[in-house]
Amino acid sequence: MDTEQVTELAAKEPVAAPTNEIASSPERFINRELSWLHFNRRVLEESVNPRHPALERVRFLSISANNLDEFFMVRVAGIRAQVREGIAERSPDGLTPTEQLKLINETVSQLAIDQQAIWRDLRKFLAELGIVLVDGQDVTKAERAWIEDHFLANIFPLLTPLAIDPAHPFPFIPSLGFTVALQLTRTSDGRPMNALIRMPGKIDRFIRFPGAKDGVIRLITLEQATSLFIGRLFPGYTVKGQGAFRIIRDSEIEIEEEAEDLVRLFETALKRRRRGSVIRLEIEAAMPEELRQFVQDALATTDDEVFVVDGVLAMNELSQLTRVDRPDLEFAPYVPRHPERVRDHGGDIFAAIRQKDLIVHHPYESFDVVVQFLQQAARDPDVVAIKQTLYRTSNNSPIVRTLVEAAEAGKSVTALVELKARFDEEANIRWARDLERAGVQVVYGFLQLKTHAKLSMVVRREGGSLTTYVHTGTGNYHPVTARIYTDLSYFTSDPVIGRDVTRVFNYITGYAEPIDIEKMAVSPLTLRKRMIEHIHGETSFARQGKPAVIWMKMNSLVDPDIIDALYEASQAGVSIELIVRGICCLRPGIPGLSDNIRVKSVIGRFLEHGRIYCFGMGQGLPSAKAAVYISSADMMPRNLDRRVEVLCPLQNPTVHQQVLEQIMVANLKDTEQSWQLLPDGSSTRMKAAKGEEPFNLHNYFMTNPSLSGRGKSLKESSPRRLTRRNERPPS
């Protein structure tokens, strides 16, 4: 999109207060919850993007539904708890919890309507492409015979028909549980009865009929298949009415501040979470009103917690459709590259790092290099110690296996396992016990702080002294998500960074606050201060008439202090470009407040997850003298105040150039996957300016090598240099 177009849009956007008043008004912030819903709207819009293959569009629809489930389990649950407890504290944008709930429900209702409309269109489109989802009444005679055999062999044994009467009270329904409610009449005497059938959660939602006549794949949902054979479950009864419902429960964990055994404490809290209060009840529109009221009363839900859905429930499960064998309807497979510099050294990653710092750009470059770093450490007789943080990792994690191998080889191994990683708590308890059994020193960090920093440290004997090798990154030690999340892995043997990381581990394990961090910044101690100092520095350069530029890339921008510092910088004339995938509480493009701030969001094939912060230092951007950092932290109060995070400077010239001039420029240059954020928090798709070629950053990185990992092959083939068109100067 042309800068002039964005400016025009911003000028037309009404603001609720005069410019000279908004700078000190709560209206200078966008509501966090509504901003998140705007983000999820962008995800949903990808399901109608004609550039995406059909099954990828289904995947985006499924992701938007899954996102919404988690939003209710965590954010809405928290706001409802505030309302229940009579808390009227206003959010930074000036809304009470009750006001926020009202706006959330209005926005979600429209979002849900749009999801169903998109699914109806996608279902028709899939049918045209040879993937047909049939309703129960539309199965052929042969299909009915097959599905009956399949039902009796694979579904019937898993179902438990539940009559509801004084002797059989309404059962507990787990969060995200999918249930069919029935109104039945006994054939012998006409006596009415209500009943439930809970759909089993461990089998596929979509059942594929055998064969594919003329290449057409036909499927039926689990609930439709079950409805064909209700008589098998309730013989002697006639169905008078039925409908499915689904609930979402509060999934927040409350923990005591004093606990002798943190693992046992979390195990107890997880059991409580399974029985959290119902915060959302989704009911099929086809369910009779009397039956609907019966379900609502049994679950003790209020009217504003009930959402009547005219369509399919549990849209998060639509992703299962992408398993059908139609690779022509998916993104072409992509195989990540391996850094050539490591190959130049015969696979010796320590030698590659000793040569100079290395940055690996996932998923374009393989996460295997991170696993290799730890595997080589585990098997190297000169390695004496390994320290590792674990926030989220995969099932059957190679990282955990390698730490076990290292401990069994007699090395000193310390693992910080974060028990408070939401929805991964149970897995992390399991990993912690496996590691302890192998002899790993397992610590759990702080009760009040989550350890979100991504750190791995290897201490190796070299030439009579010890050398510390460090890996720090923007993403989790998770080989599965590393294939779809864009993140950065930074490897260095810089002794100063090594000392800083050692101090961070000592802080986590021994609670002693580091007072002499040299290069890095650490939250909750110094990270916010470092960021604000840099923003103020650019503000000062602007006031002196020097070039003043800030580029930032993050998942979320929420922190009021950071936002206010950026507003002040904008008013001083600093040119600020922000790439914020998710929540953004800053209002861009408001005259007199944020004229010089542009915000974009990138939504595409890969999930943008890296955090990069760049400051021109009086030279503008890009510049070899710029301050460039990567971090595990977003600019949110939780990251800056309630988590252990690190901000790491990139000072090696090649690494610095790759992140600033290749990765950041590509993100800013992208037009095919980008949205421009508007002052009201909504967004509009960007388009290439007149005369400018459309640019897709994901395609660029899939087809162009990185700089720092190229080794000697860089002389033979260099990545295509990126340039950006001139933009209007800051006012």
Curated annotation (Swiss-Prot):
It comes from the Bacteria. GO terms for cellular component: polyphosphate kinase complex. Keywords: ATP-binding, Kinase, Magnesium, Metal-binding, Nucleotide-binding, Phosphoprotein, Transferase. An intermediate of this reaction is the autophosphorylated ppk in which a phosphate is covalently linked to a histidine residue through a N-P bond. GO terms for biological process: polyphosphate biosynthetic process. It catalyses: [phosphate](n) + ATP = [phosphate](n+1) + ADP. Residues 701-731 are annotated as: Disordered. CDD domains: PLDc_PaPPK1_C1_like, PLDc_PaPPK1_C2_like. Pfam families: PP_kinase, PP_kinase_C, PP_kinase_C_1, PP_kinase_N. SUPFAM superfamilies: Phospholipase D/nuclease (SSF56024), PHP14-like (SSF143724), PPK N-terminal domain-like (SSF140356). Its cofactor is Mg(2+). The active site is at residue 452. The keyword ATP-binding applies. Belongs to the polyphosphate kinase 1 (PPK1) family. NCBIfam families: poly_P_kin (TIGR03705), PRK05443.1-1 (NF003917), PRK05443.1-2 (NF003918), PRK05443.1-4 (NF003919), PRK05443.2-2 (NF003921). This is Polyphosphate kinase. It comes from Bradyrhizobium sp. (strain ORS 278).
